[in-house]
């Protein structure tokens, strides 16, 4: 029997080590059991990677993180090549251990008090007009990291007054009142929080999270700021059905959410949850039609869609697939 892992502060636990810390049993996927990727899931990498390396260098220079890299996003090459990135604040170690996610788990160090200024300067240097700020979960902080979000928003707006800011926030488990008090005082231009999947598979997919809690977070922010769009996203391919996805869409509309993203789940490693199915582009188109009929102002639905994928276009209501 292997010895239990004793977490050390500041150490990233990934793949097998991360999965060993999850209370929900997950069987390692053997290579022969992996679903073969269909043709529509194949990505063509850009021939020139200089822009990609430039963004990575800027991140390293300023001690910043992107969720694009930390979560192994399949769109990294496309987005970096177009000069866009989703910044991940509060470090690169998450206090949660969701078995679909490639972000490292562990005991994080204290937040970097200089991060808001470094982030704001980097964004100004890149001359960005739209930026997405997300974070790891920080259950170790009394406000779940809400004040750090607010500090980042304020610093960014001071250096880039005309910029649009979207926040993709964690669920602030057990800290909703405190977090919302802070965030409603310094609101973003778009408030995003992902449900990730359907309630039936939450125990397996999002251990430690609560479906109704997440809906309430979205609803309460919307009540405080009726004119600010709220947004949520789901991954498909984790054992849910299309009918269950559509029911979640109805729940989101009942809680005031107006923007939706649906994308295909991809297994980061064989230690993570396996892909149960690949949803076809036609099925994504059908779910988008359902979403628009329900009253969503925008729905980005497609195999490679992620919450922050072409987020500026999503906010303008432009077509994203």
Swiss-Prot record:
Transmembrane parts of this sequence: none
Domain Radical SAM core positions: 80-297
One family name in Pfam for this protein: LIAS_N
Cofactor(s) in the UniProt record: [4Fe-4S] cluster
Major site of localization recorded for this protein: cytoplasm
Chain sites annotated for binding [4Fe-4S] cluster 1: 68, 73, 79, 308
Keywords: 4Fe-4S, Cytoplasm, Iron, Iron-sulfur, Metal-binding, S-adenosyl-L-methionine, Transferase
Pathway stated in the Swiss-Prot or TrEMBL entry: Protein modification; protein lipoylation via endogenous pathway; protein N(6)-(lipoyl)lysine from octanoyl-[acyl-carrier-protein]: step 2/2
Molecular function terms, GO-annotated: 4 iron, 4 sulfur cluster binding; lipoate synthase activity; metal ion binding
Source organism, top-level taxon: Bacteria
Annotated S-S bridges: none
GO cellular component, one term: cytoplasm
Binding site for [4Fe-4S] cluster 2: 94, 98, 101
PROSITE patterns to which the protein is assigned, alphabetical: RADICAL_SAM
Class of the enzyme per the UniProt entry, highest EC level: transferase
Subcellular location: Cytoplasm
Family (UniProt): Belongs to the radical SAM superfamily. Lipoyl synthase family.
PANTHER family attached to this UniProt entry: LIPOYL SYNTHASE (PTHR10949), LIPOYL SYNTHASE, MITOCHONDRIAL (PTHR10949:SF0)
Protein name, as recorded: Lipoyl synthase
Gene: lipA
């Amino acid at each position: 029997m292997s010895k239990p892992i004793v977490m050390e502060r500041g150490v990233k636990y990934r793949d097998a080590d991360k999965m060993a810390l999850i209370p929900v049993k997950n069987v390692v996927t053997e290579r022969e059991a992996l679903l073969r990727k269909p043709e529509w899931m194949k990505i063509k990498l850009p021939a020139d990677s200089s822009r990609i390396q430039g963004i990575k260098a800027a991140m390293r220079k300023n001690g910043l993180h992107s969720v694009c890299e930390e979560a192994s996003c399949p769109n990294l090459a496309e987005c970096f090549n177009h000069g866009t990135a989703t910044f991940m604040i509060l470090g690169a170690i998450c206090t949660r251990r969701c078995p679909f996610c490639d972000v490292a788990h562990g005991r994080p160090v204290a937040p970097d008090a200089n991060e808001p200024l470094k982030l704001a300067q980097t964004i100004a240097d890149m001359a960005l007009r739209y930026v997405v700020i997300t974070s790891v979960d920080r259950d170790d902080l009394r406000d779940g990291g809400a004040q750090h979000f607010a500090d980042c928003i304020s610093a960014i707006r001071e250096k880039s007054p005309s910029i649009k800011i979207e926040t993709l926030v964690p669920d602030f488990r057990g800290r909703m009142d405190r977090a919302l008090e802070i965030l409603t005082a310094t609101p973003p231009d778009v408030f995003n929080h992902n449900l990730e999947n359907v309630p039936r598979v939450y125990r397996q997919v999002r251990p430690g999270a609560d479906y109704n809690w997440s809906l309430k977070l979205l609803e309460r922010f919307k009540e405080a700021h009726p004119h600010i769009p709220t947004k949520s996203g789901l991954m498909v391919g984790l054992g849910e059905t299309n009918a269950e996805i559509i029911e979640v869409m109805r729940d989101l509309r009942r809680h005031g959410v107006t923007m939706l993203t649906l994308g295909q789940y991809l297994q980061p490693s064989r230690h993570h949850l396996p892909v149960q199915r690949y949803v076809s582009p036609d099925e994504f188109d059908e779910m988008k039609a359902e979403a628009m009929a329900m009253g969503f102002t925008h729905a980005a639905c497609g195999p490679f869609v992620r919450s922050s994928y072409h987020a500026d276009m999503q906010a303008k209501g432009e077509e994203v697939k």
